[in-house]
Amino acid sequence: MSFNHQEIEKKWQAYWEENKTFRTPDETDKPKFYALDMFPYPSGAGLHVGHPEGYTATDILSRMKRMQGYNVLHPMGWDAFGLPAEQYALDTGNSPAEFTEKNINTFRNQIKSLGFSYDWDREVNTTDPNYYKWTQWIFLKLFEKGLAYVDEIPVNWCPALGTVLANEEVIDGKSERGGHPVERRPMKQWMLKITAYADRLLEDLDELDWPESLKDMQRNWIGRSEGAEVHFNIDGTDKKFTIFTTRPDTLFGATYCVLAPEHALVAEITTEDQKGAVEAYIDVVKSKSDLERTELAKEKTGVFTGAYAINPVNGEKLPIWIADYVLASYGTGAVMAVPAHDERDYEFAKTFDLPMKEVVKGGDITKEAYTADGEHIDSAFLNGLNKEEAIAKMIEWLEVTGAGNQKVTYRLRDWLFSRQRYWGEPIPIIHWEDGTMTAVKEEELPLVLPKTDNIRPSGTGESPLANIDEWVNVVDPETGKKGRRETNTMPQWAGSCWYYLRYIDPNNNEALVDPEKAKQWLPVDIYIGGAEHAVLHLLYARFWHKVLYDIGVVPTKEPFQQLFNQGMILGENNEKMSKSKGNVVNPDDIVASHGADTLRLYEMFMGPLDASIAWSENGLDGARRFLDRVWRLFVQENGELSEKITDAPNKELEKAYHQTVKKVTEDYEELHFNTAISQMMMFINDAYKAETLPKEYVEGFVKLLAPVAPHIAEELWSKLGYNETITYASWPTFDESKLVEDEVEIVVQVMGKVRAKLKMKKDASKEEMEQLALEEVKEQIEGKTVRKVIVVPGKLVNIVAN
């Protein structure tokens, strides 16, 4: 007999909604637990089976913690600004707001059909003006602190999309969306000074309970380097440029210098003879993305400018080249090249037949660059020193002579914060005709995104907002001065940087979050989501959180105490699920055919939560069969409780039950859901063999199952005679003493050969062991004389007989 999942799931979902079962009260003396999911972008495709994997994991924890007496905050919302809605609007002429609202309604219904225990009264939507009022407020605070500024920088301009793209949105020189060509062009952009927080973003990682691999990704992205800046004069001019190097000890080995093609000095120093070649080269570089110029570049390219730099340490003339592997946006946009001791410089020197000069002993520079430590040679006052000593000595020399200084740099760049799109938060800034700019007053927030039918890109590089005259043009009521609103909008990252704070206090019109509530709920106890957000989203959210900490809005330095990346659910053929491959599994179909509880159980049982695993219909059927077995064990054909269930204890199930409570509880805490489910399956096997089932064990088992399969658990709970939801029933406990084996297996040997194995009491005496063993091997020793019996208590009896 099978249970009717459609009936049961609808019934309990209606009950939870009606009774607001999962509403989180703020005032409580219970300890808190804040479980956060990465909120989804509500795409037109709807929910896919990858979403519920992480959501089920946090839901299991949330449901267990409620039963353990915690006040649990487990919310859901929508990261709803962004390119796809705008692209849809461009393609169809419909409004992105309507498209987004329709998608959100679909997502909400799908998520509710899976039985997650969210407090829907706290739902947030990044496109709601009452929400983005506070996104804009945070921007004003960044602006006040000097952390938001305008800069002219080379950006990835995509003419077809009419917008600037972030580096992540450019793949092989083409836009990720649509595969359109992308070129580099300088434009005025809003930047956020995340580099001002680089050290803190790095150091505070140590205090977090995050996977080490993820912390390393953040560390590498921030990329702290210690070294020196060195100033090079340009021969025959009064101009100079500065380079940064982590190996100032190799300055005597420099044989040429390289500037980024965009470097401001290039046009000024290039000689007449080289002008044509330099301009042609710069033209080619324009269309390449940073990634193509550096990591993806197969061969080194470059051109000599005709100019020379003077090495400050020995006065030698070094030819100045330009090459695309040096980026204007990275470091100083200039490098000194030491081909004997740097692999990239070595390749470049080999390609263009440039000289090399060995200054550190230990390698063979005819074969490759030598980058390890060694004794310095041909380096005047550094001769005989090792790397560490030579670096310190050279920095001292640079500082005394004024030729340079000690310096720490970061790979991290400031955050490009403007988008030339319509569907984003307006940036609350006004540019006046006299060249000044001011922030919109706080009391005038939210600066609402105007409705418009014309959201085509302006084509000038400005956003479609530039087309809406009545919105863009403003007049200062006090001075009559004319101005224009900022037409760039914020990136999709903005709204997702702080949403976890708004869940704490979603309806507050006076503040982003009430400080008392922030103190109560922060930091987030566990944050679960996909690894694709391991760097940027988490880095940006940590940056904003630290700014809010500095201005007293939040009480903690870090937002997320524990973080976990779920794996990916692949198609049955082990490929990534995608519409084009036709291997996407729709959760709605599974909920209809197998039930939400089955889907939840299956996704948790597939394997470790962080592994990427292929979807399997067989596995799904197996998960349903297990739930059917549970149902049949506890419920008769007529829907009544099984007659096996009794108030009397059952010694034979005692150990299995206490073991199950212990293992499932510990595994849930550790996010080892697959092994917890395995343990529950073993218990059900034992329970089928038992004559009777103590009601206490049945109730305990149903509570353990509830976080994974809440609908069937609620139904069983009501059949066990309870009128209230299982949500706040107390979590089962185990007794350590019941886990101890009171019987042991004894090996019986005759003349050293194993003849029998016996179960006996753990604390049996030597005499009892000997007596039982002799009884057991009576036949084997018949007609023989027992010479000696060796007894090892609790382990072995060896009989010597001949």
Swiss-Prot record:
Pfam families: Anticodon_1, tRNA-synt_1, tRNA-synt_1_2, tRNA-synt_1g. It comes from the Bacteria. A motif ('HIGH' region) lies at residues 40-51. Its main location: cytoplasm. This is Leucine--tRNA ligase. ATP binds at K579. Keywords: Aminoacyl-tRNA synthetase, ATP-binding, Cytoplasm, Ligase, Nucleotide-binding, Protein biosynthesis. Belongs to the class-I aminoacyl-tRNA synthetase family. It is found in: Cytoplasm. One of its GO terms (cellular component) is cytosol. GO terms for molecular function: aminoacyl-tRNA deacylase activity; ATP binding; leucine-tRNA ligase activity. It catalyses: tRNA(Leu) + L-leucine + ATP = L-leucyl-tRNA(Leu) + AMP + diphosphate.
